[in-house]
Amino acid sequence: METNFIDLRNLTELTVREFMSNHNVAGHDVDHFIAVRNHAIKALKYENISNSKKLQVEFAAMLHDVDDPKIFSQSIDYQNAKYILDTIFTKMSFENIISDCTYDVFKQGIVTLISLVSCSKNGDDGVEESWMAIPRDADRLEAIGKIGIQRCTDYANHIKLPYYLDSTPRAKTSEEALSFANRDRFDRYKNGHKSVSMIDHYYDKLLHIGRPEYLCSNNPYILEKSNKRNQEMIDYVINFKFE
């Protein structure tokens, strides 16, 4: 079984790389997909769930952005994720890996997990079972901390978003930073409000998504990583050099 999992993982990575070869966007490339998947794999070591559910989590983590409208504006109903899964399982026998559900049920379960990832759509929505939030929380780990700071900067440069405006909060302490990142701002973001600057994006979204109350997986690996990465972002906005 372990050999099959490794072969499947390698085939998945190859298939995704081929699919995304002409579609990489700053912060949303295959390296990001793999980083999110690797967080999910580490988190799954703490979960007592079936192999089929573990595979669904891993696939959802790897495929969570392949239908992102920032990359594929015409994608409908997770068509790219479904296509990649179908491609993979024409090359490898599903029945040799999973025996407790049909392929259609397995695939739909992955789509459901992917649908939970988007912050603007499903920000802090609850899940039926905590493990179902692992792909979302694993993705959030890559949006916060030092890697998240770099990704945010790269994406701001990519879409030509200003670093700050006159109206952007200027926190001097951790307490001020957290007070500016209030629930109203996060609710507006989840309801479609777009951040007006890069630093505003920290207060609208990034300083929220790594807090324990928004990490529905309640997974020990994810909670430990998020705690450190949250502080790195707070330090960043406090020490940001406004001209």
Swiss-Prot record:
* Domain of life, source organism: Viruses
Signal peptide region: none
| Stored InterPro entries | HD/PDEase_dom (IPR003607)
Its recorded name reads Uncharacterized protein L803
